[in-house]
Amino acid sequence: MIFDALKWLDLDYSEGPDVGGDYGPYRQSERFDLYGKYAKELVEKGGAYYCFCDHERLENLRERQKAMGLPPGYDGHCRSLSKEEIEEKLKAGVPYVIRLKMPYEGETVIHDRLRGDVVFENSKIDDQILLKADGYPTYHLANIVDDHLMGITHVIRAEEWIPSTPKHIQLYKAFGWKAPEFIHMPLLRNDDRSKISKRKNPVSLIWYKEEGYLKEGLVNFLGLMGYSYGDGQEIFTLQEFKDNFNIDKVTLGGPVFDLVKLGWVNNQHMKMKDLGELTRLTIPFFVNEGYLENENVSDKEFETLKKIVGIEREGAKTLKELAKNSKFFFVDEFSLPEVKEAFLKAIEAAEQVLKDHETSTQDQVNDR
């Protein structure tokens, strides 16, 4: 789904599971053995430790913390186990996870390119699980290992990851690796400033394709999220955006994902697009509306469709809307219930006015 969306939007990439590259494999499922290796290496370096606490103890711990009004978090119970105790439990096959050993004192500072320095007290940060009991890594470990081995220099992600970043910085320190530059982008918001979620909004990019938004329109609209050219320009191509983009100019105000604005932007690109190409893109929507039997049209039919699209694209926000608005070009009998109702009301009103004037003289009518 992600690959399909990127290809549709012409967002090319030089490495990945489907194109290869020098730093593969690119699927975490194919890098599974790496994570266990590096987790145990971190234990040997003193940056992590084995935790043998079972579910019952952890649940009791959470209940006690809740009763005392404390934030939930691991209490470091296994952090002080002796080497002999650890070896004994490992030999006995006691299930374990591997946790990050966060410093108890001091601060961790995130040097964020957009936000400046963000400071966290180490004592308030939990000892994060890095490797689960089933041998699978958590995001925190896999993310750091992969980014290091793949030579990642810049991590650009949503601001919701800021609270996790101190753990990531400590992981880089524990491994002795250079941390990348962190850039945390503002989250997209609904009109009411709430966070966009899958439960409330269509967040799949392919959904917008199926609804009839042009890729040029959607890319343009997304390029306006938290970013401005400065001269008021709102309509641009992907290449223009690439040529002018400066990440230091991204604003942090939480851009609003406004479907009305998206519709306007998309309409601008519909009017700019070559009429023949726009017609070809609209044909599947004509088929979906039942106006065409299939997408195979003759040259003569295509020329007719071009004329229809040329007229209707002026006011349509999407290809789907354009097709719906073209109904009267394809049907013999056409009526709009709301128009019919308004017309009948107008006739009734006129009829009443005439009745009121039945006994009026010409002078009285003129006075009115």
Residue spans of the language-model regions?
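Active-site cores that bind ATP or allylic diphosphates and position pyrophosphate for catalysis
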Residues: 41-184, 189-198, 204, 229, ...
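Short, conserved secondary-structure transition motifs
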Residues: 26-34, 187-192
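Charge-rich, well-structured scaffold segments of protease-associated domains
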Residues: 1-8, 58, 66-69, 224, ...
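Conserved nucleotide- and phosphate/pyrophosphate-binding catalytic cores
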Residues: 7-13, 119, 130, 145, ...
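Short amphipathic alpha-helical segments at helix boundaries and their inter-helical linkers
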Residues: 33, 72-73, 231-234
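Short secondary-structure transition/capping motifs
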Residues: 24-31, 50, 157
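A glycine-rich helix N-cap at a beta->alpha junction
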Residues: 3-27
